[in-house]
Amino acid sequence: MTTRYIFVTGGVVSSLGKGIAAASLAAILEARGLNVTIMKLDPYINVDPGTMSPTQHGEVFVTEDGAETDLDLGHYERFIRTKMNRRNNFTTGRIYEEVLRKERRGDYLGATIQVIPHITNAIKAKVLEGGEGHDVAIVEIGGTVGDIESLPFLESIRQLGVELGRDRSMFMHLTLVPFLGAAGEVKTKPTQHSVKELRSIGIAPDILVCRGDRAIPANERAKISLFCNVEERAVISLKDVDSIYKIPALLTSQGLDDLVCKRFHLECKEADLSEWENVIYQEANPNGEITIGMVGKYIELPDAYKSVNEALKHAGLKNRVTVNIKYIDSQSVEAKGDEALAGLDGILVPGGFGERGVEGKILAAKYARENELPYFGICLGMQVALIEFARNVAGLTDAHSTEFNKQTPHPVVGLITEWIDEEGNIEQRDEASDLGGTMRLGAQLCHLKAGTKAAEAYGSESCIERHRHRYEVNNHYVKQLEKAGLVFSGLSSDRKLVEMIELPNHPWFVAGQFHPEFTSTPRDGHPLFEGFVAAARAHQKRSLS
């Protein structure tokens, strides 16, 4: 299969939405019957985002094969059917690590290792490998043109543009076209300078996507076309919209997909965006609204919980309600108690690491259990629910996780030292292992207990969900907790690890060790999030009646 490549760059400012634009174009091409994938090339020196602070970088998105990747890969999976894997995201750090490893082995036969050609060749090889087996591969370059960190990536795609030729490569550049209120007009000069910078590197953009808070007037598009040496029809206006799921229709209405198909000589059907039209209709026509309290420790940056936020919105679409998310600092729950949790229709405790705020999460689980408020725990959210139950129902005073208290008399959650990965290999770890290599990662099978809310939600005896955690429920306490009334509704493939828990005599108190948010999409939703939102809606109706 001959793969065509679209390289996406950004200029003027960061956070223009390159990831959303790339994903939207991919969605259109997929709707035309093409097999599309997307890659993200990150210029930072970290090997991967796995050990980066969520308040700086945002969420770490986990792929089926266990790669810890940039949150943009979450956008990609929510827009297209193709599943991402570790080939879809790599960093400067990863490239340098691999090149240096080869140098130490003597693979370069004593040559002087340089950015050109050794680093650029490694980047090109990964890009070509990631695109194998697809009609079109869209490659997003992180950062903005002019960043010193991005130069090796930009040089690599410049070389690929020459090597692949015009029939197999094209360049799409996102820029900002700001509106100045005092002048009463949009300004194109930042775009002109951004394109000038890109051309100085040797890359001439084929398509310009102009971001702004309003549509770009026709005369300004003509001006951009003239000064940036881009066809006028290839100057695309991408204004701010109230829903990112409107962007595919906005782009196809301006013929962006036709430009791509014509350039690559692709004969394919017209784009069928009916699924996206249905999503937009559901979003615009809710039958009510609910408020979900998200009790976390990284709430100052909502992107730290990006996939959870989106999964709640998707569940709202399926239940025809608007889901309002109230971010609650778990430390404020420690300080204010029940007052911090008043007025909610449901509580969600997402994943997290470290001791700060954990007692507030435990209090949130207690509040939900005692007040029959729908509760959904994810990863650490399951562990705190189990700790709370152990302390206050099973009578295990001072029960805790060894992550937070190594001297706890009842370590109901602990670090396991051996487990089987997705390929059946035995993995081992201990507390001295590097943080980047100590977690159970990726998609794994979970057996569901018949008659439970979990099995009812999935409509199946099993599910496959993605993991990202170091600590597990201590099997030593399972029978004691079961006797006290806790239901272990999901077990690992070998039935040795607890994957889900729930309370049988509660409207909806369900928690999982995995991260279901990573597989939720606007078109399909996710059964656990749908069940949680439905329970929250039912609780609201009971409260109002």
Curated annotation (Swiss-Prot):
CTP binds at residues 14, 147-149, 187-192, 223. UTP binds at residues 14, 187-192, 223. Residues 291-542 form the Glutamine amidotransferase type-1 domain. Mg(2+) binds at residues 72, 140. L-glutamine binds at residues 352, 380-383, 403, 470. One of its GO terms (molecular function) is identical protein binding. Its EC number is 6.3.4.2. GO terms for biological process: 'de novo' CTP biosynthetic process; pyrimidine nucleobase biosynthetic process. Allosterically activated by GTP, when glutamine is the substrate; GTP has no effect on the reaction when ammonia is the substrate. The allosteric effector GTP functions by stabilizing the protein conformation that binds the tetrahedral intermediate(s) formed during glutamine hydrolysis. Inhibited by the product CTP, via allosteric rather than competitive inhibition. It is an enzyme of class 6 (ligase). Residues 1-266 are annotated as: Amidoligase domain. GO terms for cellular component: cytosol. ATP binds at residues 15-20, 72, 239-241. HAMAP family: PyrG. Belongs to the CTP synthase family. NCBIfam families: PRK05380.1, PyrG. PANTHER family: CTP SYNTHASE (PTHR11550), CTP SYNTHASE-RELATED (PTHR11550:SF0). Catalyzes the ATP-dependent amination of UTP to CTP with either L-glutamine or ammonia as the source of nitrogen. Regulates intracellular CTP levels through interactions with the four ribonucleotide triphosphates. CTPSs have evolved a hybrid strategy for distinguishing between UTP and CTP. The overlapping regions of the product feedback inhibitory and substrate sites recognize a common feature in both compounds, the triphosphate moiety. To differentiate isosteric substrate and product pyrimidine rings, an additional pocket far from the expected kinase/ligase catalytic site, specifically recognizes the cytosine and ribose portions of the product inhibitor. Homotetramer. This is CTP synthase. The lineage of its organism: Bacteria, Pseudomonadati, Pseudomonadota, Gammaproteobacteria, Alteromonadales.
